[in-house]
Amino acid sequence: YADLELPETMARKMNFLRAGITLPAPADSAAAARLSELTTRMGSSYSSGLMEIDGEMVDHNELENIMRTSRDPEFLAHVWDGWRRAYDPEQMSTDYAEMVEIANQGARDLGFDNLAQMWLSNYDMPADEMEAEVERLWGQVEPLYQQLHCHVRANLNELYGDEIQAAEGPIRADLLGNMWAQSWASLSDVASVSESGPAYNLDDLLVDAGYDQHQMVETAESFFTSLGMEPLPDTFWERSLITQPRDRQVACHASAWNMDYEDDLRIKMCTRVNGDDFVTVHHELGHNFYQRAYNEQDVLFQTGAHDGFHEAIGDFIALSVTPEYLVQIGLLDEADMPDESADLSLLMDTALDKIAFLPFAVMMDQWRWQVLRGEITPEEYNEQWWALRESYQGIVPPTDR
């Protein structure tokens, strides 16, 4: 249909139908079954990896919390490396390479050169223009990121000394408060700005107010109902995974689900009572309320306007968790409302989360696009991954990779 002159709405529907699949299965049924088998095995391996610490088997969710809160560099390096060895990395690499081969065939069956081109076609512009636009936008933000990187590196050097973190060059990935160094939000104590006045600690506010995980989600729901939106359905509370199950391992990465395109909305998240997760809950419910908003659309339009729109909605809501909002919901006493002298601290907290994430996101897609185009071979996966991480993020692993 690409060469047909279709009405704009019909052409958009056809593009959603053709390119709206993350991993397209080939027409061959055996290959399609194999693709499903591979993705299931990799997902299960990723979510069920355990690491022994002090005689106890610790899961990924707890390891994430350790990375967030510990300031012991030897222990951080041990946890960082141990989690990456908790599943079979060689098998994961082999499975991933086979998945790439099969999914690329599925993309070719749909008329694309490869899966990278298919993914890049979902942003209302030609694939090559989208890739160039990503680099253009990153070029605008990169100088600010470099300044943030320099500031955080200097503070880490002051905290740990030259032997752990050099005053110049890349930052050790395990010191950045996150298993993937994709958000540095938990480093607010390390990256504090001396010129700034007193702010607040959202972790402490939640604990002092006696919040539990469900109350965090209820508060996020109230954000939306205060705007005139209908409350979430009872099934949301019955069917969502809000806390980590005790009887099984699950993938704890936060996600929002639209199960029936009517009103069966859910989240899946191993929520902890801390500021990061409080913001994330608002982000995830942003997805849910957006999903509900388009459930009345034609079936092929029951999705995000394009592949970037859902995350824009989620983060727009997350950025609304401001001091003024915390006062409105009673978490922050109005007398403790930070004045203008605290603006630097609040802006730094935002930068540690949002600005620090951007080179990770660009690097991740650059690696995937190059893998899918065959520019990075399976034998080069790890080497090129870390080359891109150092180039974009300015980070290096704490152990040999």
Show the residue positions of the predicted features.
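Short beta-alpha connecting loops at secondary-structure transitions
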Residues: R266-K268, D298-A305, D343-L352
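A well-structured
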Residues: Y1-D204, P398-T399
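Long, amphipathic alpha-helical stalk/connector segments used for oligomerization, subunit docking
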Residues: P323-R401
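Active-site recognition of the HExxH zinc-binding catalytic motif
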Residues: R272-Y294, E311-L319, W367
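Post-HExxH zinc-binding segment in Zn-dependent metallohydrolases
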Residues: V134-L144, G304-A342
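Short pre-active-site segment immediately N-terminal to the catalytic Zn-binding motif
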Residues: V207-D212, E262-H282
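Zn2+-dependent metallopeptidase catalytic core
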Residues: E133-V152, L206-P233
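Catalytic zinc-binding patch centered on the HExxH motif and its immediate surroundings
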Residues: I66-M67, S222, I242-D264
